[in-house]
Amino acid sequence: MPSKDAAIVNKLGLHARASAKLTQVAGRFQSNVWLSRNDRRVNAKSIMGVMMLAAGKGTTVLVEAEGPDAEAALAAILQLIADKFGEGE
């Protein structure tokens, strides 16, 4: 199962709009996608789960994917995070 740590770099962290974008991207893939922070692991396709991580700017999350398109799912989520969820800040 591919996985990688990613730092949340956008100004507002995983707020509602960023969480919605992340769940939309995760939902495009057949694979299961999870985000973990500290001891909490959530389904990246669940907006409530993603928001419950309370991941602010500078927080590191572990992104994991398992399934037929796991590598592509992981790459897409990591790219979204690196692009600051399209927010520019």
Map each language-model feature to its residues.
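Compact, glycine-rich, soluble single-domain proteins
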Residues: 9-57, 82, 88
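Conserved beta-strand core positions
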Residues: 4, 33, 59-61
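Short amphipathic
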Residues: 1-10
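C-terminal structural segments of small proteins and small subunits
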Residues: 56-89
